[in-house]
Amino acid sequence: MSATASVATRHDWSLAEVRALFEQPFNDLLFQAQTVHRAHFDPNRVQVSTLLSIKTGACPEDCKYCPQSGHYNTGLDKEKLMEVQKVLEAAAEAKAIGSTRFCMGAAWKHPSAKDMPYVLEMVKGVKKLGLETCMTLGRLTQEQTQALADAGLDYYNHNLDTSPEFYGNIITTRTYSERLQTLAYVREAGMKICSGGILGMGESVDDRAGLLIQLANLPEHPESVPINMLVKVKGTPLAEEKDVDPFDFIRTLAVARIMMPKSHVRLSAGREQMNEQMQALAFMAGANSIFYGEKLLTTKNPQAEKDMQLFARLGIKPEEREEHADEVHQAAIEQALVEQRESKLFYNAASA
């Protein structure tokens, strides 16, 4: 397949086609991915997001990779839903260090009715700070999805994790079809989709291909596709899994870029385990989004300063959003924080 042949957006990928991409010589695959990438993006710009865990631990799901699952003893303390004000303060800090998108994650099977007002207030508050908003709250009803859209949520993250064939080996408390249904609700409500998967759970190359096929063959490609490397946490069933070969990880990023040419492909969890050379290869393969800051939910993430140093060495700059002038934007931040302190939803969000 020529480097330009896969620039067009497609939704009809077959396993044989995707397998052929994975089997290309490494240099040919990276050349094709970089060519596709340059057709749609500035190759020297990377979108920067910050992720905050707004509710940690005791999740009823049994995802074998996750330290937040209540099924496993990982030493992670259960925490209540964060106060709205604290979330906004964290968002303001993220803005100050260069993030353009603020992602909020809660360890839930699905959000409860009592928590939804606070979640919606978080979305509205973060939007006032001039950041794009993203949330991952588990499975959603159609009504909850619409409420989030009405509050101004830009992105909803709901990963497929792996192929349909391998999925049952990793999760039994939520079906693949339920995940796809949530994505359908998100799209129907007019929000953007963030959905990807995890490498290193014992899956085959065909499973990696199957995951990408599920994502690329959706009616519309996800705007953001996070590709995670398993972070092995003691106490989870996958703690002793074999490490992913770095070249296999880069291959998956490259194939994702070719199959979903207009999507942001995010270098997500597991980045702390990657040296600078591997991260540089990831950007060459078409990754153009990262999580930035001190923590990625409950696992470590490279320090923000190191990220900017690497960007400088590679000649990469963060993507920018159109926004207010600095003075106006700072005033907007301060006003949003004042309004939030005065809100009746400010105190003890978990006890409502």
UniProtKB/Swiss-Prot annotation:
Pfam families: BATS, Radical_SAM. Binds 1 [4Fe-4S] cluster. The cluster is coordinated with 3 cysteines and an exchangeable S-adenosyl-L-methionine. Binds 1 [2Fe-2S] cluster. The cluster is coordinated with 3 cysteines and 1 arginine. Its cofactor is [4Fe-4S] cluster; [2Fe-2S] cluster. Its EC number is 2.8.1.6. Pathway: Cofactor biosynthesis; biotin biosynthesis; biotin from 7,8-diaminononanoate: step 2/2. PROSITE patterns: RADICAL_SAM. One of its GO terms (biological process) is biotin biosynthetic process. The keyword Transferase applies. [4Fe-4S] cluster binds at residues 59, 63, 66. Residues 44-262 form the Radical SAM core domain. GO terms for molecular function: 2 iron, 2 sulfur cluster binding; 4 iron, 4 sulfur cluster binding; biotin synthase activity; iron ion binding. Coiled coil: none annotated. Homodimer. Belongs to the radical SAM superfamily. Biotin synthase family. This is Biotin synthase. It comes from Pseudomonas aeruginosa (strain ATCC 15692 / DSM 22644 / CIP 104116 / JCM 14847 / LMG 12228 / 1C / PRS 101 / PAO1). The lineage of its organism: Bacteria, Pseudomonadati, Pseudomonadota, Gammaproteobacteria, Pseudomonadales.
